[in-house]
A protein has these predicted regions:
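PLP-dependent amino-acid enzyme catalytic core
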Residues: 1-351
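The conserved cystathionine-beta-synthase
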Residues: 361-389, 425-452, 461-475
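Terminal peptide-recognition signature
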Residues: 100, 123, 182, 288, ...
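Bateman (tandem CBS) regulatory domains
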Residues: 261-264, 346-361, 367, 413-424
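Short hydrophobic beta-strand motif reused across regulatory alpha/beta modules
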Residues: 399-403, 407, 456-464
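Short hydrophobic beta-strand segments in globular cytosolic domains
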Residues: 393, 398-399, 426, 450, ...
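Structural motif
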Residues: 86-87, 110, 133, 196, ...
Length: 475
């Protein structure tokens, strides 16, 4: 270009279909809709997956992040040079950090300790300051994820709390974009919309739009972890991140997000951790789609629903994020085996040593030392778990262990959580004896046996090593 020639704009031409954007935030949305073909064998209805991991930040939460930041800028709550703060399981924080970085804001994100290592790494890569805190805390605890985030926002000059759970801009993002996209992509033929329920923003905003535009014809179905209180579960922990509603037993009440509009959701299908994990692995190996656990839960629910529908039905299931954020979890054979989410092989397995044992003994986290010693009896140690009414015990709710020797010297009226030792080793119920012995290594303490993430029994380390030695010698 010759000198002295005026240039009106250096921006490239932008038009529908060109996918040219001047900012990363502008590239959010308009994600692909892909038909599922292999995992739908025997199903007459069409099942399509909305691939939200194709957003720039890798998840559906990019939509809410952009919407919330833009709303805060418009209202003046977030000013130039400000700090974006949020408590999140990871994806919303990543979206916020991405948009914030592109606009010159600082970001501080508080995440629970069950958040995958990959998500924490993504956050830090975007320049976010990450605070990790224990996830299994009651809602009124000062160090609960959302309470820490609120405190940081209040104490930080220029701090703004995104507050995704109760922020109407969360719902608005999906009413304005996700819903219209699905209606346009399906040519108005969508009959059923399936999505997980986390903050409620995605299913409420998208579902509300689809119901309005279809004059109530579209059915909205929520996919929810079995233990989640959204479907009437007792709130126990589960292993699928980013959906459902966990309730700590010491929380004074079960407060649901304001973004979850229950009137939009026609029904909820519950999904177990095992079903979700099995589904994500099947999607990767049969469909070529690497999706996260919440997407696996949603697809599992969608397939179950689709099997009941006629050939003229069109089911759309929303995939929130990619499996790349969970390679150390759902796609890691060792992680899957340790928690008993795998299938048994022909080898003698750990579960064969349990026999017809009674429910495994545990010490509730609110027990006194005297009460714990009574439960222990002559046992050397036992796991300490969150206090719940009698039911299946999720491995994730083991908060540590106590030893008889430590408690004998302690104040009998003190609480056992003041005397915790590290958690006991966990082995999968379907692991071979050799694999289990290798896993515990030199640990001589009691071993927790897990099946589908649930404690199925306790064994002494000696039981494992002796039987394994016997198997190797042919006894």
């Amino acid at each position: 270009m010759s000198a002295g020639v005026a240039v009106e704009s250096t921006a490239l031409p932008s038009a529908p279909g060109l996918n040219v954007y001047e900012t990363v935030a502008a590239a959010i949305g308009n994600t692909a809709l892909v038909r599922l073909n292999a995992v739908t064998e025997g199903i007459e209805a069409a099942v399509y997956a909305k691939l939200e991991f194709l957003n720039p930040g890798g998840s559906v939460k990019d939509r809410a992040a952009r919407s919330m930041i833009e709303a805060a800028e418009s209202s003046g709550e977030l000013a130039p040079g400000g700090t974006v703060v949020e408590g999140t399981s990871g994806n919303t924080g990543i979206g916020l950090a991405m948009v914030a970085a592109s606009r010159g804001y600082r970001t501080i994100v508080v995440v629970p300790d069950k958040t995958s290592a990959e998500k924490v790494a993504f956050l830090r890569a975007h320049g976010a300051e990450v605070r990790v805190t224990e996830g299994a805390r009651p809602t009124d605890h000062p160090d609960h994820v959302r309470n820490i985030a609120r405190r940081i926002a209040d104490e930080t000059p220029g701090g703004w709390l995104a507050g995704q759970y109760d922020n109407p801009a969360n719902i608005g993002a999906h009413y304005a974009s996700t819903g219209p996209e699905l209606w346009q992509q399906t040519g108005g033929r969508i009959t059923h919309f399936v999505a997980g329920i986390g903050t409620g923003g995605t299913i409420s905003g998208t579902g509300r739009y689809l119901k309005e535009v279809s004059d109530g014809f579209v059915t909205v179905v929520g996919a929810d972890p079995l233990n989640s209180t959204y479907n009437g579960g007792d709130g126990r922990a589960y292993y699928i991140e980013s959906i459902g509603h966990f309730l700590h037993p010491d929380s004074p009440e079960d407060i649901w997000p304001e973004c979850y509009d229950r009137s939009v959701v026609d029904s909820i299908l519950t999904v177990t951790d095992r079903e979700a994990i099995t589904t994500v692995r099947a999607l990767a190996r049969r469909e070529g789609l690497l999706v996260g656990g919440s997407g696996g839960a949603a697809v599992a629910a969608a397939l179950r629903l689709a099997r009941t529908l006629p050939a003229d039905a069109t089911v759309v299931v929303l995939i929130p994020d990619s499996g790349r954020a969970y390679l150390s979890k759902y796609f890691d054979d060792d992680w899957v085996a340790r928690l008993g989410f795998d299938d048994r092989t022909g080898d003698v397995a750990v579960t064969d040593l349990l026999g017809d044992t009674l429910d495994p003994l545990t010490v509730p986290s609110d027990a006194t030392v005297a009460e714990a010693l009574e439960v222990l009896g002559d046992r050397p140690e036992l796991p300490v778990v969150l206090r719940r009414t009698p039911s299946s015990l999720v491995v994730a709710e083991i908060v540590g262990s106590v030893t008889r020797n430590d408690l004998i010297a302690a104040n009998p009226t003190s609480v056992v959580t003041e005397h915790l030792s590290v958690p006991l080793s966990v082995v999968g119920a379907f692991e071979s004896l050799g694999a289990a012995v290798k896993r515990i290594g030199a640990d001589t303490r009691t071993v927790v046996v897990a099946e589908s993430g649930i404690v199925s029994g306790l064994l002494s380390a000696g039981q494992l090593t002796d039987r394994s030695s016997g198997e190797r010698s042919g006894r």
